[in-house]
A protein has these predicted regions:
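Short, conserved, surface-exposed binding loops centered on an aromatic residue
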Residues: 48, 84, 103
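Conserved beta-strand termini and adjacent loop/short-helix elements that scaffold enzyme active sites
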Residues: 26, 114, 150-154
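Extended active-site neighborhood of metal-dependent phosphoesterases/phosphodiesterases
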Residues: 1-45, 76-89, 115, 119, ...
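Beta-strand-turn-beta hairpins that frame and shape the catalytic cleft
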Residues: 15-25, 50-55, 105-111, 142-147
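Active-site environment of divalent metal-dependent phosphoester hydrolases
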Residues: 1, 31-34, 62-66, 90-106, ...
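Short beta-strand segments
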Residues: 57-59, 94-96, 112-113, 151
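Active-site-proximal segments of metal-dependent phosphoesterases and phosphodiesterases across multiple
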Residues: 52-91, 98
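A short C-terminal boundary segment appended to hydrolase-like catalytic domains
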Residues: 138-154
Length: 154
């Protein structure tokens, strides 16, 4: 990082409670790799510390993507999904690295990625391509267990 600055999320997993929800920031970055990896033991320990609904936040996609973006996945995503599918309080998984908006529910858990404010990728191609006009961000509204995710274009 710049001049040796190393933000805490680079090497740590962190948790914060916000409005009755527990947000776990799971570090999936691995030096010199474009794919991600996480510690199953650390994830399980963090989940078991939570009371109430849980949102997991990580950089690498924990589910298959379209086209060329499958090169950027969470390497041990099967283990990740196995862990969270057996936990009743996991409601939301937010991830990045895709630079486009996705949202789908799998076994009652909402998975979503946000578009990028800098540039967006076209996910439906076999090779890298910028998707002009798709830049934006997501607005996430949570009311109890009701989750609404809206994509906003810039």
């Amino acid at each position: 990082f710049y001049n040796g600055y190393k933000p805490s999320f680079y090497s740590n997993n962190e948790m914060v409670e916000l409005c009755g929800w527990n947000f776990i920031m799971l570090n999936s970055a691995v030096r010199d790799m474009s794919r991600g990896f996480f510690s199953p033991e650390k994830l399980s320990n963090l989940i078991h510390q939570c009371k109430g609904s849980v949102a997991l936040v990580l950089h690498h996609p924990p589910i298959e993507q379209e086209g060329w973006l499958n090169r950027k996945l969470l390497e041990n995503r099967d283990k990740f999904n196995d862990i969270i599918q057996h936990e009743e309080n996991i409601r939301l998984v937010l991830y990045g690295h895709t630079h486009f908006h996705t949202k789908e529910a799998i076994n009652g858990i909402v998975y979503s990625s946000a578009p990028s404010i800098g540039f967006a990728f076209n996910p439906n191609l076999h090779k890298f391509e910028i998707a002009d006009g798709e830049e934006g961000f997501s607005i996430i509204e949570i009311d109890g267990d009701n989750i609404v995710i809206t994509k906003q274009f810039l």
